[in-house]
Amino acid sequence: VLPAFGFSSTTMDNVIINTYPAILLIGYGNELRSDDGIGQRVSNLIASWKLANLYTLCVHQLTPELAEILVNFDVAIFVDAYPATVEQDVQVSPIELVDTSVTMGHSSNPSYLLGLTQALYGRSPQAWWVTVPGVNFELGETLSPVAEQKIEVALQEINHLLKTVDSDGEYKPKYHHLAFGSSGFCSNQQE
């Protein structure tokens, strides 16, 4: 159940004007597979910031049922881990909708979930995907030192993103664009 949208607003002549977009941050991944739990860890850390217009959600995987929640927000930020080398860094990329005519099953990726939200409700939030490198995806509940270090970078990037999103949910990223391979993993491409 979502809390009431009590984000910051100003009142002029008895008209309430929202000055901040409603933002949902979804951290996802399996906390029992070491670095795969990065997304949920980041979501929990950001929840402690207690920002009035920011809601956080931790899930094991992205499911179609999340579309019903996403439609209520202006901006969505998805946070997940990706298998990487020590040299790779946090990546922030705008997410484009995908065609939802192909069924993805019970779990999906952010692009498909946004496309589904658009198809079902006629709108979807502006969205970004924050991917954080991890090196250990074996069974376990402890994050690798690389993951711990990159989480700090992710928090800085998300903080910058939150400060840059305006009242319309618009943002002009200065980051690299991610291309999605057939394996479901991302490859970094310069724009």
Q: Where are these predicted regions, by residue range?
A:
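Helix-loop-strand module that forms the ligand-binding subsite of alpha/beta enzymes
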Residues: 82-127
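A generic local secondary-structure boundary/capping motif
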Residues: 13-14, 67, 117-119
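N-terminal amphipathic/basic-hydrophobic helices that include classical n-h-c signal peptides
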Residues: 1-11, 182-183, 187-190
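Residues at secondary-structure transition points
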Residues: 33, 37, 104-108, 145, ...
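Phosphate-binding/catalytic loops
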Residues: 112-191
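A conditional alpha-helix N-cap/helix-loop micro-motif detector
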Residues: 56-59, 110, 151
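A short glycine/serine-rich beta->alpha loop
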Residues: 28-32, 99-102, 139-142
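Nucleotide and nucleotide-moiety/phosphate-recognizing core
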Residues: 16-25, 31-97
